[in-house]
Amino acid sequence: DLWHDIGWGWRQRAEAEHPVYWLPNGKDSWQMRHFDQTIDLPLHQPLIHVNWYEASAYCNWAKRRLPTEIEWEVAATTEPASGGKEFSKTKRRYPWGDDGGNDAATLSRANLDGRGLGCVDVAAFAAGDSAWGIRQMLGNVWEWTDSNFEPYPGFKADSYKEYSEPVFGTRKVLRGGAWATRSRMVNNKYRNFFTPERRDVFGGFRTCAPHNWP
């Protein structure tokens, strides 16, 4: 019940028992490959090298789920109003506000531009929190969403239509950029798209849970 049928088929073919590049270290601990080294699993960094099927199966096990693309964007872009029960009409360009797009503006707010030479602690960069208090929505790792990669309303292909148009509906959306993403490129609407079986060094995920509004 934890796995999608296609995801379970992938797991059987790949003989996947754990995230790629993980190595068992005794009975209850793990190590992982980090460039050309073997290190203890960093428990306070994002999980990487997991595909969409694995992320979705974990969410089912944890009784949580992946956010949809629009949920991710609302969490990054909007501000609370009416005592936190509604969204304001204000939309931010970056989770922390409208100041960004360069090294200086993101230096204390996001792990971008390769500065960390890899992932950093999930508690780092508090100055980059969204209006809802959500941390590291930009940088560190690309985050899987539950949504298929589809065109925005009014989409028109430019001269590079072969870049995205042929794969609409066949990829899953990731949001947020990774530690190697250039700060001049990333903002709250920046998208990426991977095949659901791709286990990428720059890809991870965050989970969400249903919330009952009062």
Q: Residue locations for each model-derived region?
A:
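A generic structural micro-feature
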Residues: 168, 197-199
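Short, P/G- and charge-enriched loop/turn segments at secondary-structure junctions
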Residues: 191-196
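Functional-site microenvironments in short loops/helix caps that host divalent-cation chemistry
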Residues: 1-190
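Short, structured beta-strand segments at or near domain termini in extracellular proteins/domains
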Residues: 201-214
